[in-house]
């Protein structure tokens, strides 16, 4: 009852004169899509718009609802894409994401095409020179009486640039979507869509290279990053099922993938007093059968190391180890959001509520495998096994999480010069289910080689966790004159651990993750220039992270020999602080347009301490407070010109990222890099269009690696001219697209 009263009190606080931004003051809040679909690392997911604090993946709002409840565990891009079936797409404001999602970020926000005033069809076909084929087909038509329908089919058959013997298609995505809509005479609207999605993703964007030590890399032998495969042609894998403890086999291609059904419905109507009401709901039923092969270390194998070929011949040479996670998950969601918005004089108000539920049955099995560290490698056995030391990192959780929130936003237009907007979100979260935690008295739940739920003494642990989350936002715009203005934003959120974080050997901390972002600056706008310069401070407390840390064993332990670089997962909490200065400008001069962005920042860890314990008994407390955040550049620069003469459009996008630290000790780093794109579009008519695009036209490698052996190293000397493996940018890729409209 106290929680309900708390939520009600916050909602009542938001009822006083809620408002929308006045048009005359909107110059400080421009939206765009920031070329969010131009991702140099992946051709199937949006890029993350960085605020200086790392995050994996991005939230996505589709038709007023999250495409997925979580960004990490079941990322939103698995069910979403922007194409012919998309009506509009832009980015959320920071206060929008905080109030609607409880998170801070610039996230894609799209609406789907459902119905049309007249019958229309469109087909888009894209091919690249590596053999990727995409087809997007959309058909929409009125049905009479205000009813309409829409059909969309999307197929992506992607061979990847480093063709794998394991599979012909590294990624095969199939979306089938059908929808109906009804428009009422009073302007109201109803729509419903059903989508079936099937996704198989076996891409492996990894390769070996020489880390020189000065931030640069050199090729390893004849291996070509982005072009050569770094996986053996092993069609299946072995694992120990954590449910029954049996050793089983699974095929990567035939038995893998993600399948889901998604039903979405929405209703919008203007009420008698002029207020606008909207209600949206989405149900997703999904089953995942996925593998993730994380890079381990590259080792020197001798005659007695235990590595050998299938015929028993010992192997001597470089060995690449991989740590594989196999997910068998049912991940289902029911998400509903309702909003009510109205106006009163020069003010307007918005109120909303979320009821989001995820129920999942998650089994994560782990194992290891190894192969020759070279291109087109052969698989190696370790002590006679192709897949060895299973389930030392096994995870299990069966249960649900409900998130129930109310939010409101107020805006006051005090004068043509001054606007103030404030918002609140209050959220109650409940997580319940069963896990297998290695707590005091439950030591048998501790993971070891071959562990399962039927191992001796293993006991399930009931989980019941209640938390209060929330957000508060404040935006102030002051117009100095017709061109100049001032802007101040403040956004605060509180979050707690999510359902998927309860799968591990130990429960996550119950401490909240608090985010506070404050920024302020000036903006300028005239007929050809839109300019904004902002200084921001962003702090995130109690950040939850599961890190992979490496230590060279001093004696045989855990099923590994002495000298083996053992990698273990350790969960920890820490804080991060980022002080940034960002200048953003849009230039519009006739057929020429230019977007430029420069960010200078100082990203650092704080309150970062943890104590790993390895199989040989080694344990030490590490403190990395004050270190630069790994993988986060201090300087980012974006240059995006375009020129549109007649039926042509020529464009380019170049992003510069300064030095990025490899390890948390900041002893190793990678040199600056450019991510580049360019293209030309030609509209033959309003029915036929062609596009030629080039990804990474500078063909930079952009190699990056965690160098696990150096994860806790202070001395960079042992890692000069060091053989390692990591990721890279997509190699230079030429794409050609044709779009036909009927």
Regions found by a protein language model. Give the residues of each.
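C-terminal beta-signal and adjacent terminal beta-strands/loops
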Residues: 4, 8, 20-24, 658-661, ...
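Acidic, small-polar-rich N-terminal luminal/periplasmic segments of exported/outer-membrane proteins
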Residues: 20-118
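Transmembrane beta-barrel wall of Gram-negative outer-membrane proteins
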Residues: 120-122, 126-157, 164-228, 263-266
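Outer-membrane beta-barrel proteins
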Residues: 126-134, 156-185, 201, 236-266, ...
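Acidic/polar loop-and-plug regions of large Gram-negative outer-membrane beta-barrel proteins
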Residues: 189-262, 292-323, 376-391, 399, ...
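Surface-exposed loop/turn segments flanking beta-strands in extracellular/periplasmic regions
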Residues: 212-223, 298-314, 363-393, 439-456, ...
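Face-selective signature of the C-terminal outer-membrane beta-barrel domain
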Residues: 258-289, 314-443, 467, 471-493, ...
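Gram-negative outer-membrane beta-barrel transporters
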Residues: 416, 525-664, 686-687, 737-741
